[in-house]
Swiss-Prot record:
Major subcellular location class: membrane
Disulphide bonds in the chain: none
Annotated GO CC locations: plasma membrane
GO biological process: toxin biosynthetic process
Protein name: Uncharacterized transmembrane protein YshB
Record's keyword annotation contains Transmembrane helix: yes
Membrane topology, as annotated: Multi-pass membrane protein
PANTHER family to which the protein is assigned, alphabetical: COLICIN V PRODUCTION PROTEIN
Natural source organism: Bacillus subtilis (strain 168)
Length: 177
C-alpha cells in the first residue's frame, strides 16, 4: 500500500514539474535543497531546547527501528528540530522564489523547459518523500512501522538514497549519543 502511495507521489511530482517547467521547478528544488542544508546546519542548536516536548516511550516494547543504532530520544528531538527549521527555511525561500518565478513566464524553448521541469519535479518529490519516510521511521507507532516494514520502496528510499541515507542517520544520531 505504501509503495503505491509513494509511486503516486513521484508521478504527481513529475507531472507538476512538467507543468511548471524547468525555471520554476529549479527555483523550487534549489529552495528545497537550501532548506535541507539550513536545517542540517542548525538543528543541533535547536534540539536541546525542545526537551519540553514529551518524547515517546522508546522502550523495548515499541516497534524496532532497525537502522538506528544511537540514542532514539536524541534522534527524536533532532528530527523535530530538523523539520521545524526545514519548514521555516522552505517558507521563506518560497516567498523569495515567487518573486523570481516571473522569469518562468518568458516563452523560451517551452518543451525543453517542461521536460527538464519534469525531471526536477520528480527529484523534489523524491527528496521530500525521503525526508518524510526518514522522520516516520523514527516515530514509534506500530501501524506506521508495520506499513514501512512491508514497503520495499520505502526501504530502498530510506536505505539506498545516495549520500543522504548515511548523512541523515549520522546527523540525527550524533546528539546525545
Amino acid at each position: 500500500m505504501l509503495d503505491i502511495i509513494i509511486l503516486i507521489l513521484l508521478l504527481m511530482g513529475t507531472l507538476l514539474g512538467l507543468k511548471r517547467g524547468f525555471i520554476l521547478q529549479f527555483i523550487r528544488l534549489t529552495s528545497f535543497i537550501l532548506s535541507i542544508a539550513f536545517a542540517a546546519l542548525f538543528y543541533k542548536n535547536v534540539a536541546p531546547h525542545l526537551h519540553w516536548i514529551p518524547a515517546p516511550d522508546f522502550s523495548a516494547g515499541q516497534p524496532a527501528l532497525s537502522f538506528f543504532t544511537g540514542n532514539l530520544e536524541a534522534a527524536y528531538y533532532n528530527a523535530i528540530a530538523f523539520i521545524v527549521l526545514f519548514i521555516i527555511a522552505k517558507i521563506l525561500l518560497r516567498i523569495i522564489g515567487s518573486f523570481l518565478s516571473i522569469v518562468a513566464g518568458i516563452p523560451v524553448i517551452k518543451q525543453i523547459n517542461q521536460m527538464l521541469g519534469a525531471v526536477l519535479g520528480f527529484l523534489e518529490v523524491y527528496l521530500f518523500t525521503f525526508v518524510l519516510l526518514y522522520v516516520a521511521s523514527v516515530l514509534p507507532v506500530d501501524a506506521l512501522q508495520q506499513m514501512m516494514g512491508q514497503s520495499s520502496l520505502a526501504n530502498v528510499i530510506i536505505n539506498h538514497t545516495p549520500y543522504l541515507s548515511g548523512l541523515l542517520q549520522e546527523l540525527w544520531t550524533q546528539y546525545g549519543a
